[in-house]
């Protein structure tokens, strides 16, 4: 009964709304204002208390903020510093050669892990930045779809009053309108959450309005290529886990060789060293396989994203052609306004998918650059981003 009353109330509000004869064109013209500011007064009312007003930020700035605010980076920095200090002290105290080698390996591995932590934070920033742009576009698209559904419902109600269609058709469109309205609410909520997450990750105040000054999609290059063998070599040199596995196997081998003389090592000690060598060799083999798989998967994903981008471009071109035909039909009176608006919205969504495909492609390129040891922040600087 409560649900039936709720639906009846909603339909009553719809009748009041359609009595005002809303214009779809006005709604569509206002949609760009929603891109990153949310749905207007409702967004401001929902904004956290004390939230700042406006933030303009580029991709490189966002990356710097993520790195500065990353707990993982701070932890890696501390570990790298402690490892370097432990090795320095061991050298000063003239520790045994194998002990020095172990400490040196730990220090070098910690430095590689620090670079990985910084790159991981940078990648998270890029994904969050692109994700915020995508959330804004999705909210804009949902508002446009709602405006189209609203106008279609208004027209269908008029046609029903004129006896041209049945009430079931109107009810179906009312359901479609309510679904579109729910999608708008969820999209606006996702947009607010994306903005809040971005600010929190950079450890800055929450902002009601965020202006993204970098067009991530424009950075994508579908002609980019990588050589599998070259990437594998570079990835091995950059991976802290692979480096640690290699050095551990080397040290285990040296210790095993050093204990082969029965005059200086007991049988149990030699057996333990042999077992340690086998374990180290197995870990190295697993690390090598894991790294090779990661490189292969990353490059396969890159190829897939390039193909997806090309497909989305073709789909957008087809949508453009369909819109041209729809405008001709509308000009000849063969199509209603809401039908033309629906075609326009379909074209906009097709181009939004192209933009998202480009952003996804660029993010994947940065993941590969990070994997092969490139500094993501430096890559962005070389791209001219500030």
Regions found by a protein language model. Give the residues of each.
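Bacterial N-terminal signal peptides that target proteins for export
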Residues: 5-26
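Short, solvent-exposed, mixed-charge loop/turn linkers that connect secondary-structure elements
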Residues: 188-230, 366-386
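Bacterial Sec-pathway N-terminal export signals of envelope proteins
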Residues: 2, 32, 43-129, 164-167, ...
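Coiled-coil heptad-register positions
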Residues: 84, 91, 98, 111, ...
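Charged, solvent-exposed structural "stalk/scaffold" segments
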Residues: 76, 83-103, 117, 137-184, ...
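Bacterial N-terminal signal peptides
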Residues: 26-37
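Acidic, low-complexity, intrinsically disordered peripheral segments
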Residues: 3, 43-59, 113, 201, ...
């Amino acid at each position: 009964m409560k649900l039936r009353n709720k639906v009846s109330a909603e339909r009553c509000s719809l009748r009041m709304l359609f009595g005002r004869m809303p214009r779809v064109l006005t709604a569509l013209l206002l949609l760009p204002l929603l891109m990153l500011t949310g749905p207007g007064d409702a967004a401001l009312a929902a904004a956290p208390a004390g939230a700042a007003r406006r933030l303009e930020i580029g991709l490189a700035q966002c990356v710097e903020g993520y790195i500065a605010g990353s707990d993982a980076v701070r932890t890696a920095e501390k570990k790298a510093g402690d490892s370097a200090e432990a090795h320095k002290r061991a050298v000063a105290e003239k520790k045994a050669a194998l002990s020095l080698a172990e400490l040196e390996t730990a220090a070098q591995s910690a430095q590689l892990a620090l670079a990985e932590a910084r790159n991981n934070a940078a990648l998270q920033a890029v994904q969050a930045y692109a994700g915020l742009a995508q959330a804004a576009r999705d909210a804009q698209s949902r508002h446009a779809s709602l405006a189209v559904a609203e106008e279609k419902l208004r027209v269908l109600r008029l046609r029903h009053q004129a006896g041209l269609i049945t009430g079931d058709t109107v009810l179906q469109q009312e359901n479609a309108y309510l679904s579109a309205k729910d999608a708008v609410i969820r999209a606006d909520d996702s947009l607010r959450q994306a903005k809040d997450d971005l600010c929190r990750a950079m450890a800055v105040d929450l902002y009601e309005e965020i202006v993204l000054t970098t067009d991530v999609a424009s950075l994508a290059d579908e002609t980019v290529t990588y050589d599998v063998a070259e990437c594998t070599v570079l990835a091995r040199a950059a991976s802290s886990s692979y480096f640690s596995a290699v050095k551990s196997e080397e040290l285990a081998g040296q210790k095993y060789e050093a204990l082969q003389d029965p005059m200086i090592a007991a049988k149990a000690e030699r057996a333990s060293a042999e077992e340690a060598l086998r374990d180290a060799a197995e870990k190295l083999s697993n690390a090598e396989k894991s790294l090779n798989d990661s490189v292969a998967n990353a490059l396969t994903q890159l190829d897939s994203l390039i193909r997806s981008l090309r497909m989305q471009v073709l789909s957008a071109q087809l949508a453009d052609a369909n819109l041209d035909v729809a405008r001709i039909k509308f000009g000849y009176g063969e199509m209603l306004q809401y039908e033309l608006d629906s075609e326009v919205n379909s074209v906009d969504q097709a181009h939004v998918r192209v933009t998202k495909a480009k952003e996804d492609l660029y993010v994947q390129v940065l993941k590969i650059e990070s994997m092969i040891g490139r500094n993501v922040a430096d890559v962005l600087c070389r791209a001219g981003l500030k």
